[in-house]
């Protein structure tokens, strides 16, 4: 048995392949290539199963609502995530990973590297958020997201871990 290391496919090569072989528009192919981070299998699953991108859209809309909402909404969301966690541990960890990528994009824009944004279909919203939040608080939130994933994997109380996470969501410091 030999371990085989595979490198991610380049974004340009994947975009071309998806346009030519799967008749996607350039924009659709570019989005899938960016979101897949070079994993062709993920991009092909997203083409076959439309719910993958639909669920992502729904989760990102929830994220924006939670960020804009107050503590009451955030704690209610933590309660919903706790119930979901008890049914599907991996789905909540994947959601936290999506949040990490989202806030990473906010940081990338704050640092002036728009070409590195992963969620290119939400570029306008991300740019707005990059101007509304303090970068140190965003960094702290990303750290807390990573810690929350770790705590949940280590069997911490999910409700407590998720409520602590909600407290780490930064407050807007500027209006767009």
Predicted segments with their positions:
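Charged, glycine-rich active-site and insertion segments that engage polyanionic ligands
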Residues: 2-98, 103, 109-118, 122-176
């Amino acid at each position: 048995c030999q371990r085989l290391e595979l490198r991610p496919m380049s974004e340009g090569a994947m975009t071309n392949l998806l346009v030519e072989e799967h008749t996607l528009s350039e924009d659709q192919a570019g989005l899938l290539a960016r979101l897949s981070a070079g994993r062709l299998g993920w991009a092909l699953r997203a083409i076959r199963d439309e719910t993958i991108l639909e669920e992502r859209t729904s989760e990102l809309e929830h994220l924006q609502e939670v960020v804009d909402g107050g503590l009451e909404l955030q704690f209610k969301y933590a309660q919903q995530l706790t119930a979901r966690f008890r049914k599907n541990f991996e789905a909540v960890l994947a959601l936290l990973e999506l949040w990490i990528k989202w806030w990473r994009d906010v940081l990338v824009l704050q640092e002036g590297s728009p070409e590195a944004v992963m969620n290119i279909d939400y570029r306008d919203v991300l740019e707005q958020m990059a101007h509304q939040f303090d970068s140190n608080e965003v960094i702290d939130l990303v750290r807390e997201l990573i810690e929350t994933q770790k705590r949940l994997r280590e069997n911490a109380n999910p409700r407590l871990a998720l409520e602590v996470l909600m407290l780490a969501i930064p407050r807007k410091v500027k209006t767009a």
